[in-house]
């Protein structure tokens, strides 16, 4: 049973100057939450055969993250790169990724990380599943292929849940599900020397500018700022009754209770 697997990944910002989102290559890396999804895909290919394709959306600097996936051993990498995609929110991003996935039909499985380290929404995977009308499960720990379906396990609220998903399907992978492999130096050298990442523009996706970018985004980011947490610790002393009275008074004074 050979599997055609697509893994959607993102190049995320790290170590950028304070208060700025800089997407140049020196400040970007492969989203760490995508690494477990990629590892599961590679393990499935090694066990059952088939191919793994990584897809990302972003500026040209995002090519570096895709080259890293090629160094890990994926068969094909595609970057959705077009100026019209700038300013896309999660829905517009899902629209572009969904168009790319459709173009890669037939496929058996689409994998996402549960979220990205920069925007941290966790929305793009489920939105893509809805747009493609694919059965989907989030926070998946394990995937077991069977005839015309996948058995997946997720963990939530202290429970283990098992689902049977018909092919094709889309899942988001829990970061604790598996330990990602290291990138070997030889793989890095070969991937950067080859630079086989494909670039697809909006025309190749069959989309119009109105469907993506700011025109296709029902939400907009108004501002970005770092939130500084201020913690204060207050110790209650005295007898148990006195502490209870002080705690009740504190709840009222802070507006926690009326």
What are these regions (language model features)?
Residues 1-258:
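N-terminal glycine-rich FAD/FM-binding segment characteristic of electron-transfer flavoproteins
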